[in-house]
Amino acid sequence: MSDEVLRADSVTRRFGDFTAVDSVSMTVRPGEVVGLLGANGAGKTTLIRMLLGLLATTEGAVELLGGPPDRTHRARMGYVPQNLGLYRDLTVVENLSFSAAAYDAAIPDLPAALADVRNTLVGDLALGAQRQTAFVVALAHHPEVLVLDEPTSGVDALSRAELWDTIRAQADGGAGVLVTTHYMEEAQQCDRLLLMAGGRLVGSGSEDDIIGDTRAVAVHTPDWARTFAILNAADIPVILDGRAIRVPDTDPATIDEALSAAGVEAEIRPVRATIEERMLVLARER
């Protein structure tokens, strides 16, 4: 068996003249959590669907658990898609029973948080409870690889933390995990990161590897709202973090010139760039 639970070799997917994924190579090994990052439309979901055999490649090859991504190998995988993959007109326990029968597995015990809603239709549950249900379904047959597409999107911070405890427990138990996320604090919990932009893999490794030589400055001024509007109107990339203004990949002199012309005084100082700022720079370059 291969040392990787997931593998893509120079994978490309085209839809007509549009290239959604362009010559991407990547791996996921047992026991590690790999974060797949990128803006909307970067190609993350298309790549995942090819890795799982749900979408054919135009070029290149994929492997799931050392073999083709067929039904036999998918039976050893757990998958939580963006839409959760649950039957909204069935109850929580009915969803679990259906999945257990499909995988010839025992019906799993419900976590305490779902015990009181076991007979509730999934469509009537809060989003956090739906995501917890999707996790229980995906883990019921003890998968060797777990693929999670935006698994915590739209849920509260406590629910996100609980779901990430589950993700880490799966990796600690030997499963390989591939997860997409828009939350940078979640990216920091991954063992390794992959960054996609415009269908291509543009960075991999640690957080520092992803950020690379991207630079950023912080702009401090009491009139933060006006400052943001001025910089935005000058086509300068701006990120607003509360009332703090950050500007990636821009000469401080350019920022000072735009603000001085509008009569705004501000303190401009270099700061360490973030993954989010690297993604913004890449999006503007394309």
Regions found by a protein language model. Give the residues of each.
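Conserved ABC transporter NBD signature motif
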Residues: E59-H73, A112
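C-terminal coupling/interaction segments
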Residues: T250-R286
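ABC transporter nucleotide-binding domain
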Residues: D165-L178, H182-D249
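Catalytic Walker B motif of ABC-type/P-loop ATPase nucleotide-binding domains
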Residues: L146-E150
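Helix-to-loop junction immediately C-terminal to a conserved catalytic motif
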Residues: L52
